[in-house]
Amino acid sequence: MAKDIIFSDDARNRLYDGVKKLNDTVKVTMGPRGRNVLIQKSFGAPAITKDGVSVAKEVELKDTIENMGAALVKEVANKTNDQAGDGTTTATVLAHAIFKEGLRNITAGANPIEVKRGMDKICADVVAELKKISKPVKDKKEIAQVATISANSDESIGKLIADAMEKVGKDGVITVEEAKSINDELNVVEGMQFDRGYLSPYFITDAEKMQVELNSPLVLLFDKKITNLKDLLPVLEQVQKTGKPLLIIAEDIEGEALATLVVNKLRGVLNISAVKAPGFGDRRKAMLEDIAILTGGTVISEELGRTLESASIADLGKAERILIDKDNTTIVNGAGKKDDIKARVDQIKAQIAVTSSDYDREKLQERLAKLSGGVAVIKVGAATETEMKEKKDRVDDALSATKAAVEEGIVIGGGAALIKAGNAVKENLKGDEKIGADIVKRALFAPLRQIAENAGFDAGVIANAVSINKEKAYGFDAACGEFVNMFEAGIIDPVKVERVALQNAVSVASLLLTTEATVSEIKEDKPAMPQMPDMGGGMGGMM
């Protein structure tokens, strides 16, 4: 297929047109008075959202060169969302502002490579300044404030996330689901939960809730399949003498072994249940070891020279309560020693620090969360499906922003921190490198200007007033139209969100500015399909 090749200024101008169209669509969602964007769906009702990355994902332009420009900035939004969970609109607005200003200078004769070098240097300096002016999140109130801002000033969402984080801890798992009612709910699962349910419904003890409940149970952990009952008999006889319930967690239990366990349960000989071990391969072995440490038990492993026949009461773990439904097993208050659990947590944290695989890191973080805290489930309620999806987007954003704030600290919000950090940087650059640095410093005003503009205020006046004021916490509250102490007003942003948004925006804008040619496919206009001939006369004898 023939290709269309465009060079230098023509190429960059066409790319800019695409970036501008994307930015104009996304920027209206910014700030407490940001507007909604209505998105047509291929089926069902249209979606309505104020989530920048959701809007960006839907933008596809007809012109192929423009679409390439938009696609690169979409990548900024997606990458920022992946890394920080929020700040997608900020990243898009920054990327557009840097590209626009840079394009003007390069068209006037500046060297793109020197300009890029200056942009990279000032970006590193501003990031260092942001970290310097940040402060750690100290209490529940600040967590609620971060979540509220990210959820478009919805205080109920902020409180919900703060409550969830208070209950499960900073490393705990918090998930977001759709509620069955119009009310928001927070359910906390204390202890450890993994995604394996009972192997047979005959193990159920609570028919109304369709779940197994074991009080003060013992826990047998085995890393292979159990098919032969003979191997299990010695430990089962010992458990029966204690009169306590037993949970068996193994790779699988099948055939004669499972059938005999079910019969013993139904006859009341032994209160017993069985589930498959979570995970696969080496990860399964690691998770079994996690459960052993949590419950104070030992994994029976043939690799360590242990057989199932050799298992004794001393090898079994203990817990206050275990709940099992068809999908999940929850261990409440395991009897493991706190020092052992802490050592295991530290070991997993060390593995997270050295792994280079995103997938491995995610799985290690799941294990860390299961060991170090419970699981909080936020159920989002709304009157309609459209409202539900929009609200769930905001809760996801707020949750990600809150985790980012806990991780790296907070700065004043509303775009003011970027301006203050930019003003504090003193660079000694010359020539086109200085032009690159100045481009970024001017672009740092763009988020605040956009927030003010969306709220109906004079963007230039507001941005200038914030810039010239020397108070570190001075900023503009667009919700009420006043200049305030941003920390006292609770208008704060995670420093990670600001940092990632700026770094990604500078990265993609500098790529666009150093582009000298574009190669794209030439779209061929296909002839329209011929009309079907008239069948005439309708369907004759049909009534």
From Swiss-Prot:
Keyword Membrane in record: no
Cellular component terms per the entry's GO annotation: cytoplasm
CDD domains named among the record's database cross-references: GroEL
EC primary class: isomerase
Keywords: ATP-binding, Chaperone, Cytoplasm, Isomerase, Nucleotide-binding
Cellular localisation: Cytoplasm
Binding site for ATP: 29-32, 50, 86-90, 414, 477-479, 493
PROSITE patterns with a match to the protein in the record: CHAPERONINS_CPN60
Biological processes per GO annotation: protein refolding
This enzyme's EC code(s): 5.6.1.7
Gene3D superfamilies linked: GroEL, GroEL-like equatorial domain, TCP-1-like chaperonin intermediate domain
Keyword Chaperone appears in the UniProt entry: yes
Catalysed reaction, written as an equation: ATP + H2O + a folded polypeptide = ADP + phosphate + an unfolded polypeptide
InterPro entries listed in its UniProt record: Chaperonin_Cpn60_CS, Cpn60/GroEL, Cpn60/GroEL/TCP-1, GroEL-like_apical_dom_sf, GROEL-like_equatorial_sf, TCP-1-like_intermed_sf
GO terms of molecular function: ATP binding; ATP-dependent protein folding chaperone; isomerase activity; unfolded protein binding
Reported function: Together with its co-chaperonin GroES, plays an essential role in assisting protein folding. The GroEL-GroES system forms a nano-cage that allows encapsulation of the non-native substrate proteins and provides a physical environment optimized to promote and accelerate protein folding.
Record-linked PANTHER family: 60 KDA HEAT SHOCK PROTEIN, MITOCHONDRIAL (PTHR45633)
UniProt similarity note: Belongs to the chaperonin (HSP60) family.
Subunit: Forms a cylinder of 14 subunits composed of two heptameric rings stacked back-to-back. Interacts with the co-chaperonin GroES.
HAMAP family: CH60
Protein name: Chaperonin GroEL
Gene that specifies this protein: groEL
